[in-house]
Each structure stands twice: as C-alpha cells, then as structure tokens.
C-alpha cells in the first residue's frame, strides 16, 4: 500500500495540538521525533514530554487530499503562525515485511538464543526462545533487554519462581522458563503486554508455567528471582513494591537505567540488597544484587 506523509516543524507547546489536528484530518498514524538530537531521558510517570524542537509526522493514504490537511492546520491561528511543513510520497513497500527481514536471531551468553518466530533456529541444541513481539516492547535488540537476558543466562534458575515486573512481550519470563524456572509470573500495566506474553509463551510451549497479571490483580507470593526492565524513576518510586515480591536471599536485576541514573537507583536499593557491580552496555546499565535476610 502506498502512503503519503506530512512532516511538520513543532515545539513542546504545540506538538500535541498538531497531532490532534492531523488525527482529525484523517491521519492513519502520528509520530513524534526529536528534530535536534535533544534527548528526553525520562518524563514523569503519566506525562508525555516533547522536545523543544519536535517533528510531527502524519501518515495518510496516498490518495488523501493533503490540501485539506494543510487548510485544517492553517485554520488554527496558534499553529498557522509558524507553520512549516513538507509533504512526501513514500515508496510502496511492505513495511512489516521489511522490519521482519531485519530482525535476526541473537545469542546471549553461551546457551540462550532469541529467535524471531519466522526465522530458522541457528542452534537446535541451544536454549531457544521463539519471539513474535506483536504490540508489546521487547525483542532482545535493545541494550536494556540484553543486559537482563545475559544476567538470567548466568543464573541457576532450576526450579525457581521468577517475576518479570513490566513483562512486555514476555521475552525475559519465557527465557527464564527455558533456562529452568519452574514458575514465571509476569506483571504489567498494559493488557496488550499480557496478551503478547501469553501468545509468545504458547509459541514456546511454556504457557503452563506462565501466569500474567495486572498489578491490581496479582496474588501474594514470594519469588526467588525478580527482573524489572522498566525505567529508573519507577524503579526508585516502586522499590518497596518490587522488593516485596522477593524473598530474603533472592536475587534481583533491574535495567532501563541510563548510566548517569545507575547510582541513584543503587542508593535506593542498597539498604535492602547486597549490590553486585553495576553492568554497563552503551548508555545503559543493570543494577543487580541479593536481598538481605
């Protein structure tokens, strides 16, 4: 299917309004990107923060009347005042297929492979996790996921109960089961993540060992292992909740933490866990340790 897109120069004050206008004009999707490489590391929970210079991209069917889109934008005085845009015809290609073609099997440690469900397995004798990310985050390609997978691969998980706090696609939990865990509990605030986790667990033949819950529905339990690949701020703010899932002597690994945030996370957990050395991969880190008795 062919598409046409409009790229609009925006700022933190009007990006959301421009997005609403594009949706009103019939946009199939709206994307925000940083126009000047000014990273926003971590907005407050429940908020959306835009860059000072933001590019808003609206995607439309190739036959859409783009003059009507521009007219709608110009009709709003606050947008029209400094409206700068570019309309581009996109190449007709199968974008989903292109993404699939660029997602390859990845090895973590000595035993573990994460394999797209549509690819051949490189090593049938290895611990293989077949993954179809679907609508949830987690393919193994991001440094934070990789840091957690490498840590799990290094642990003795045989017969253990493992919690994945913020389970996303289920990649960490399924890997834990494949590495020997007896019971896996995935917790996420997004129902789509729970659905993706269950789908991937079925694909890997481990659904009988996986339980998934929204936070408000989770039962009481005490786990041997907790992994939490979320963000530094919720890791700090929810430390009592996360630690409450872990039995004394249990092990925890946390990521989604930028290098400059690692010490602040470690400081919050230090009274409660014996910390390991902080692991670093690129701009990201992993904080791990063992819960004190």
Curated annotation (Swiss-Prot):
Compartment(s) where it occurs, according to its Swiss-Prot or TrEMBL record: Cytoplasm
Example GO molecular function: protein-lysine N-methyltransferase activity
Catalysed reactions, as listed in the record: L-lysyl-[protein] + 3 S-adenosyl-L-methionine = N(6),N(6),N(6)-trimethyl-L-lysyl-[protein] + 3 S-adenosyl-L-homocysteine + 3 H(+)
Keywords: Cytoplasm, Methyltransferase, S-adenosyl-L-methionine, Transferase
Record's GO cellular component terms: cytosol
Main location: cytoplasm
GO biological process: methylation
Enzyme Commission number: 2.1.1.-
Family annotation (InterPro entries): Ribosomal_L11_MeTrfase_PrmA, Ribosomal_PrmA_MeTrfase, SAM-dependent_MTases_sf
Residue positions binding S-adenosyl-L-methionine: 145, 166, 188, 229
Family membership: Belongs to the methyltransferase superfamily. PrmA family.
PANTHER family cross-referenced by the UniProt entry: ELECTRON TRANSFER FLAVOPROTEIN BETA SUBUNIT LYSINE METHYLTRANSFERASE
HAMAP family linked: Methyltr_PrmA
Name listed for the protein in its UniProt record: Ribosomal protein L11 methyltransferase
Organism: Pseudoalteromonas translucida (strain TAC 125)
Gene that specifies this protein: prmA
């Amino acid at each position: 299917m062919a598409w046409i897109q409009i790229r609009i120069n925006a700022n933190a004050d009007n990006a959301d309004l421009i997005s609403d206008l594009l949706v009103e004009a019939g946009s199939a999707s709206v994307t925000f990107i940083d126009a000047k490489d000014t990273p926003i590391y971590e907005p407050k929970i429940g908020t959306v923060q835009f860059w000072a210079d933001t590019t808003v991209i609206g995607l439309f069917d190739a036959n859409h009347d783009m003059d009507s889109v521009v007219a709608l934008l110009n009709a709003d005085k606050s947008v029209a005042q400094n409206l700068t845009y570019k309309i581009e015809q996109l190449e007709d290609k199968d974008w989903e297929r292109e993404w699939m073609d660029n997602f390859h099997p990845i090895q973590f440690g000595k035993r573990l492979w994460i394999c797209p469900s549509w690819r051949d397995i490189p090593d049938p004798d290895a611990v293989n996790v077949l993954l179809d990310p679907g609508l949830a985050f987690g393919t193994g390609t991001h440094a934070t996921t990789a840091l957690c997978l490498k840590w799990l691969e290094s642990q003795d998980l045989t017969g253990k109960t493992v919690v994945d706090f913020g389970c996303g696609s289920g990649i960490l939990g399924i890997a834990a089961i494949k590495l020997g865990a007896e019971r896996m509990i995935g917790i996420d605030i997004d129902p789509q993540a729970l659905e993706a986790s269950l789908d991937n667990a079925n694909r890997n033949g481990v659904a009988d060992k996986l339980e998934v819950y929204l936070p408000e529905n989770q039962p009481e339990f005490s786990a041997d292992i907790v992994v939490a690949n979320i963000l530094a701020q919720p890791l700090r703010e929810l430390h009592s909740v996360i630690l409450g899932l872990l039995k004394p002597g249990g092990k925890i690994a946390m990521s989604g933490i930028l290098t400059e945030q690692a010490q602040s996370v470690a400081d919050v957990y230090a009274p409660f866990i014996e910390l390991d050395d902080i692991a670093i991969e690129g701009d990201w880190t992993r904080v791990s340790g063992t819960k004190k008795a």
